[in-house]
Amino acid sequence: MPHSYPALSAEQKKELSDIALRIVAPGKGILAADESVGSMAKRLSQIGVENTEENRRLYRQVLFSADDRVKKCIGGVIFFHETLYQKDDNGVPFVRTIQDKGIVVGIKVDKGVVPLAGTDGETTTQGLDGLSERCAQYKKDGADFAKWRCVLKISERTPSALAILENANVLARYASICQQNGIVPIVEPEILPDGDHDLKRCQYVTEKVLAAVYKALSDHHVYLEGTLLKPNMVTPGHACPIKYTPEEIAMATVTALRRTVPPAVPGVTFLSGGQSEEEASFNLNAINRCPLPRPWALTFSYGRALQASALNAWRGQRDNAGAATEEFIKRAEVNGLAAQGKYEGSGEDGGAAAQSLYIANHAY
């Protein structure tokens, strides 16, 4: 076997590794604010707000205007293309607002899922064309990490070997291209919670998917110390009749990661996958209390599970912006504690935080 050509210099590797470690510093996670225009339409329609560019800007401003309390619990924010070039009411670019808090700016770079021909409704993710040029531009515009989401689903016949292999290779190509441009890739192979499968089945599929992803990353010479993983937690299907404890979910999740994710990876930033805000926090907390050795930071990269209460409090009204921002800060602080296994629960049984955020066949 010939030697691989050294694609990255020592300086490039150090930059990537430093960025990744900043994002997942102890007690810090990621705010995923990269919902597409279509996804924002769904969010805003829930509160009776029209999906205009200005309303999307105002809503993102609610999140980004959080004060310095978020410095200790948010290490990175994932932007959508439109948001990367928007400004707050005072004309300050959102990118600068986030960077001034010492938080790393990221960007969603995939172009969405498309059908994978010859499969039972499975998908791959598009967006590799022109990705290198886009990454170079995003780097100039202030982004230091990126996100790419692939989607797999569990049923009697899926995920197929073809879908697993194809999505693993797409993620590896994306990761390699990002690193060439000084951008840390977040690798997101999401296994959807749709279905009635139990915890064991999800664990088995998660292990097979992650094993394929890390084989592909190795084949593509991706520098693991300069990457992050954004997986699903191992949970039962949404229609599964069995209820599992956070401790059972934590044990299954950490076991799957220990069997597949190399210790060179600095951090695992879980997606919330339609869990309620409280559920996502309790499960993350249990994962960080799991008695198994865990060589990586285990933290959050939450969208809905950081935003649902804030969105509910805002309802499109300027007068509600301050209260909505407080709701976001509260969730960020809670998850910062959960990322250290220090969350004891809020004592709130009801309210928006306990509402399921599940959406069937969730597309971003």
UniProtKB/Swiss-Prot annotation:
Disulfide bond entries: none
GO biological process: epithelial cell differentiation; fructose 1,6-bisphosphate metabolic process; fructose metabolic process; gluconeogenesis; glycolytic process
Protein's UniProt keywords contain Lyase: yes
CDD domains: FBP_aldolase_I_a
Site residues (Necessary for preference for fructose 1,6-bisphosphate over fructose 1-phosphate), renumbered to this chain: 364
Pfam families listed in its UniProt record: Glycolytic
Record has Phosphoprotein as a keyword: yes
Superkingdom, natural source: Eukaryota
Enzyme Commission code: 4.1.2.13
Catalytic activity: beta-D-fructose 1,6-bisphosphate = D-glyceraldehyde 3-phosphate + dihydroxyacetone phosphate
Modified residues (N6-acetyllysine): 111
InterPro entries in alphabetical order: Aldolase_I_AS, Aldolase_TIM, FBA_I
Pathways per UniProt: Carbohydrate degradation; glycolysis; D-glyceraldehyde 3-phosphate and glycerone phosphate from D-glucose: step 4/4
Residues reported to bind substrate: 56, 147
Residue list for modification Phosphotyrosine: 5
Keywords on record: Acetylation, Glycolysis, Lyase, Phosphoprotein, Schiff base
Any one GO cellular component localisation term in the record: secretory granule lumen
Additional notes on this entry: In vertebrates, three forms of this ubiquitous glycolytic enzyme are found, aldolase A in muscle, aldolase B in liver and aldolase C in brain.
Entry similarity comment: Belongs to the class I fructose-bisphosphate aldolase family.
The protein, known as: Fructose-bisphosphate aldolase C
